Amino acid sequence: MSGNTRLEGPSPQGTGRVPGLRPPAGQSRGKLVFLGLCLVLIGLNLRTAFSSFSAVLTEIRASGTVPEWAVALLTTAPVTLLGLFAPLAPVLSRRFGSKRVLLGAMVVLTGGLLVRPTEWGSAGHLPGLIVGTALCGAAIALCNVILPSEVKQDFAHRLGLMGGLYTTAICASAALGAGFTYPVFQATGEWSAALLFWAAPAAAVVLLFAPVAVRAPRARAGADHGGTNVWRSRVAWHVTLFMLFQAMTSFSVFAWLAPILRERGIDGASAGAMVSVSILLQMLGSLFAPTLAARMWDQRGINVTVALMTSLGFALSILGPLEFVWVWIGLLGLGQGALTAVALTMIMLRTRNPHTAVHLSGMMQGVGYGVGSLGTLIVAQIHNTTGQFALAGWAFLAIGVGAVTFGYLAGRRRNVDGAG
């Protein structure tokens, strides 16, 4: 493998900025602020499709309109789609321009959220749920990949700040879907109305972002900023495997933390409160971690620290003494939010131009989400085989070793690309 470039000279991240980099030419402060707002609002829509479905899953099952095999499909397919469609983002971005692809993805996401709760005549809700979920997964995959390269392109002078804001928005998106979907169901009495609700904020972002995307310069025909094949870069693989182990843990926490706490004897209300606190702490961790990472000479220390916090917090939530469960939840929440944020920040800190950033983002999220989704299946298989979650705690300690190892390697002060 090749493409490993050691960085020389004074720290480019010493103050959370990259010295010598200024806002893009022709971009006024007001335009940059508005663009930053749009990117954050896009982030706020990237997890509601997942968490809103989980919030009313009991009601969907009780309605009898969706068979159990479809429930399994609808809960696991979205994460798989994130991995399958991520590699398409660099191709589309090169052809149409990244902002136009972002806009198109948000249009598709809005369409998916509109289709998902619709009833298709005698076929019922199942076709709409499947088609809508597929559209949402594909659209979110494209946004996941392009957002970091957009930050790299337009906010290279504020990587830490913008990285923190958009990753916090993604964490907040999961919290919004989990927290507001059930109240909408209670108000309307229809789970389909509760799911349909989330098309409104997505449509609002489309209207807000459309003028920015339409006025953005088109990608130059045949433009290829030359050179770096991220799939042959050792640094790119270190970053990708760091993302993979992060994703295995994060998606497992998202899917299984509440059932794990319930099985340990914690009542439903308390388990829900613990999950909510964990999500709030994730937001806090994701807000500050990118800025801290960008200010460091290299990121080995922060990568290892947050990987240890996450794996220990999750394992102890499964295996540790219950009298300290709030400590384990706090450790997990802060660690997981920071781990997700620094993994995504590696895209910007390990590349020198937006072209390489979008290719690295497609690689690490394609592999990371595609393979990382197996984490939820590992937990399910362990529980189905043993009847309990205890073995999963040991499994995620082993996964934590992988996150620590590749977090250390990804954190070394090297770039994927030598150009730029």
Regions found by a protein language model. Name each.
Residues 51, 79-87, 174-175, 279-287, ...:
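Residue-level signature of mid-helix packing/kink "hotspots" within the transmembrane helices
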Residues 132-168:
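Cytoplasmic helix-loop-helix junction between adjacent transmembrane helices
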Residues 299-343:
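C-terminal transmembrane helical hairpin of 12-TM major facilitator-type secondary transporters
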Residues 84-126:
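Conserved MFS/SLC helix-loop-helix module at the cytosolic interface between two early adjacent transmembrane helices
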Residues 34-68, 86-89, 144, 253-258, ...:
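Extracytoplasmic
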Residues 157-158, 164-214:
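Helix-loop-helix hairpin linking two adjacent transmembrane segments in secondary transporters
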Residues 53-54, 234-286:
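Extracytoplasmic gate region of multi-pass secondary transporters
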Residues 354-390, 396:
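A late C-terminal transmembrane helix in Major Facilitator Superfamily
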